[in-house]
Amino acid sequence: MGGEVRGAFETLLRTLSLAPVVVQAPAMGVGENQRPTFLLPVRSSSHPLLNPDLDYSVYLSNPFFFVFFQVIILLVTVYAIGSEIKFRTGDEWLEAARMNMFVAVVGKLLPYTIIFCIMSVFANYIMFGVMHIPFACGFWPLNLTAILFVVATQALAVFLFSLFPAIAIVISVVSMVGSLGATLCGVTFPVDSMYAPVHYASYLFPVRHFVEINQNLLYGDYGFPYTWVNVSSLFAFMLLALVLLPHLKTAILSHKYENIR
């Protein structure tokens, strides 16, 4: 997208810079028929890969869907877990999982994970199968990346809820995180052009890694060596959630967050 903006800007500057030459051309002995070749002896011709029509929907449809989808995943996940504390059913929840916090969280979130994954695959089918948005890779790499993104985003939601185990607080927190992720994912403004602290902060959001992986798959499919850092980062979000599960279990058993409104 930045290339198209730069090209349009250069075209405008070229037109403005040629205006004085056009005015002085008769005095220089250049005829009207010779002016085009005199002013522009070489004409550039651009052929964008995978998007020859320069249709912005090709660039924006897929990332924008998942940018907004991650907000829904965050909100639904924290509410699914937080409702156990809000409605004071945390003890029964843990007893059903035999006091194993990992089993309790997986059992609670697995139905949502399946639903979100189906929605992601269906969205990819609509965009790439029905709307015929061009892409450079196979269909399954896109779906596997979307599934990994769903699980990583849910893991981030579990991590945030473990830090703030009160649903009244964490709803606001994940809403802010979702908004920041949408801003810093690099879809509408290149992350490399942001201030250095903001640039590095963008990698704290799963959606940023998802966008980088997807751009590699859609516009070149350069292979795993170019995206292994992003894939590893998505798995790292799952480890963060696992680290704070004991704290979440303690918060549920303490009952001190049940009265926070």
Residue ranges and their predicted role:
Residues P20, Q24, I73, T89, ...:
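Short amphipathic alpha-helical interaction/hinge segments
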Residues P36, S45, L49-D53, W93-V106, ...:
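Juxtamembrane loop-helix boundary motifs flanking transmembrane segments in multi-pass membrane proteins
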Residues I114, F122-I126, P134-R261:
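Membrane-spanning alpha-helical segments of multipass transporters and channels
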